[in-house]
């Protein structure tokens, strides 16, 4: 019986330690969505001006290098940070939110990869 109580207490403490509040989750999700929305907006502005869109090469930048669109960054979950315009793949300091963010980035990157050529 003591083992059962210990197991319940350990499981509860582990769940509490890794639990993320709904505010943290919604903040991380909205940040990820805004990053991919900015890709669409940047590309639309180029097309509106009637300019020939610059040829972006898919997976041409490594983490920490300067970028313009998410599809330039190598890695399934790598994105082009919207403030410094560098490739990064970390979303949050919380490991659960970071894993969720990386999964969401991978989904978004599968869409934004059409902005870059595969050269």
UniProtKB/Swiss-Prot annotation:
Recorded domain comment: The presence of a 'disulfide through disulfide knot' structurally defines this protein as a knottin.
Keyword Protein biosynthesis appears in the UniProt entry: no
Compartments it resides in: Secreted
Disulfide bridge map: 59-74, 67-80, 71-116, 73-87
Phylogenetic classification of the source organism: Eukaryota, Metazoa, Ecdysozoa, Arthropoda, Chelicerata
Alphabetic keyword roster: Disulfide bond, Ion channel impairing toxin, Knottin, Secreted, Signal, Toxin
Lineage top rank: taxon: Eukaryota
Listed name of the protein: Toxin ICK-8
Cytoplasm found in the keyword field: no
GO CC list: extracellular region
GO MF, any single term: ion channel regulator activity
Tissue/organ expression: Expressed by the venom gland.
Family: Belongs to the neurotoxin 25 family. ICK-8 subfamily.
Signal peptide: 1-19
Record's function text: Ion channel inhibitor.
